Curated annotation (Swiss-Prot):
Sample GO molecular function, one term: proton-transporting ATP synthase activity, rotational mechanism
Protein name as catalogued: ATP synthase subunit c
Keywords carried by this UniProt record: ATP synthesis, Cell membrane, CF(0), Hydrogen ion transport, Ion transport, Lipid-binding, Membrane, Transmembrane, Transmembrane helix, Transport
Signal peptide from the UniProt entry: none
Keyword Transport attached: yes
Pfam families associated with the record: ATP-synt_C
Function: F(1)F(0) ATP synthase produces ATP from ADP in the presence of a proton or sodium gradient. F-type ATPases consist of two structural domains, F(1) containing the extramembraneous catalytic core and F(0) containing the membrane proton channel, linked together by a central stalk and a peripheral stalk. During catalysis, ATP synthesis in the catalytic domain of F(1) is coupled via a rotary mechanism of the central stalk subunits to proton translocation.
Segments traversing the membrane: 13-33, 55-75
This protein's GO CC annotations: plasma membrane; proton-transporting ATP synthase complex; proton-transporting two-sector ATPase complex, proton-transporting domain
The UniProt record lists the keyword Ion transport: yes
Gene: atpE
Subcellular location: Cell membrane
Amino acid sequence: MDIITLAEVAGNLSVIGYGIGTLGPGIGLGILFGKAMESTARQPEMSGKIQTIMFIGLALVEVLALIGFVAALIIR
Protein backbone atom coordinates (compact mmCIF):
# COMPACT_ATOMS: atom_id res chain seq x y z
CA MET A 1 0.00 0.00 0.00
CA ASP A 2 1.18 3.48 -0.69
CA ILE A 3 1.02 6.39 1.73
CA ILE A 4 -2.02 8.03 0.09
CA THR A 5 -4.14 4.92 0.52
CA LEU A 6 -3.11 4.62 4.16
CA ALA A 7 -4.01 8.28 4.77
CA GLU A 8 -7.44 7.75 3.20
CA VAL A 9 -8.09 4.67 5.34
CA ALA A 10 -7.04 6.53 8.50
CA GLY A 11 -9.34 9.42 7.60
CA ASN A 12 -12.27 7.08 7.04
CA LEU A 13 -11.64 5.30 10.33
CA SER A 14 -11.62 8.57 12.26
CA VAL A 15 -14.98 9.53 10.73
CA ILE A 16 -16.41 6.14 11.68
CA GLY A 17 -15.01 6.55 15.19
CA TYR A 18 -16.64 9.97 15.49
CA GLY A 19 -19.94 8.54 14.29
CA ILE A 20 -19.81 5.87 16.96
CA GLY A 21 -18.70 8.48 19.50
CA THR A 22 -21.83 10.57 18.89
CA LEU A 23 -24.12 7.70 19.85
CA GLY A 24 -23.56 8.24 23.57
CA PRO A 25 -24.33 11.97 23.59
CA GLY A 26 -27.34 11.38 21.32
CA ILE A 27 -28.80 8.81 23.67
CA GLY A 28 -27.93 11.01 26.64
CA LEU A 29 -29.76 13.99 25.15
CA GLY A 30 -32.84 11.88 24.51
CA ILE A 31 -32.90 10.66 28.10
CA LEU A 32 -32.20 14.17 29.43
CA PHE A 33 -35.03 15.85 27.54
CA GLY A 34 -37.44 13.00 28.22
CA LYS A 35 -36.85 13.13 31.96
CA ALA A 36 -37.05 16.94 31.96
CA MET A 37 -40.46 16.80 30.26
CA GLU A 38 -41.60 14.12 32.66
CA SER A 39 -40.46 16.19 35.65
CA THR A 40 -42.15 19.34 34.31
CA ALA A 41 -45.40 17.46 33.76
CA ARG A 42 -45.20 16.06 37.27
CA GLN A 43 -44.33 19.37 38.99
CA PRO A 44 -45.20 22.37 36.77
CA GLU A 45 -44.27 24.88 39.48
CA MET A 46 -40.63 23.74 39.29
CA SER A 47 -40.38 24.18 35.51
CA GLY A 48 -37.92 27.11 35.70
CA LYS A 49 -35.46 25.24 37.90
CA ILE A 50 -35.85 22.04 35.87
CA GLN A 51 -35.18 23.97 32.67
CA THR A 52 -32.02 25.52 34.13
CA ILE A 53 -30.69 22.14 35.23
CA MET A 54 -31.63 20.68 31.84
CA PHE A 55 -29.59 23.32 29.99
CA ILE A 56 -26.57 22.68 32.23
CA GLY A 57 -26.90 18.96 31.52
CA LEU A 58 -27.27 19.72 27.81
CA ALA A 59 -23.97 21.61 27.82
CA LEU A 60 -22.18 18.79 29.63
CA VAL A 61 -23.50 16.14 27.24
CA GLU A 62 -22.68 18.22 24.15
CA VAL A 63 -19.09 18.62 25.36
CA LEU A 64 -18.68 14.87 24.90
CA ALA A 65 -19.67 15.15 21.23
CA LEU A 66 -17.33 18.11 20.72
CA ILE A 67 -14.43 16.24 22.33
CA GLY A 68 -15.09 13.34 19.96
CA PHE A 69 -15.11 15.72 17.00
CA VAL A 70 -11.82 17.32 18.04
CA ALA A 71 -10.26 13.89 18.63
CA ALA A 72 -11.34 12.80 15.14
CA LEU A 73 -9.71 15.89 13.64
CA ILE A 74 -6.50 15.42 15.63
CA ILE A 75 -6.17 11.75 14.72
CA ARG A 76 -6.80 12.52 11.08
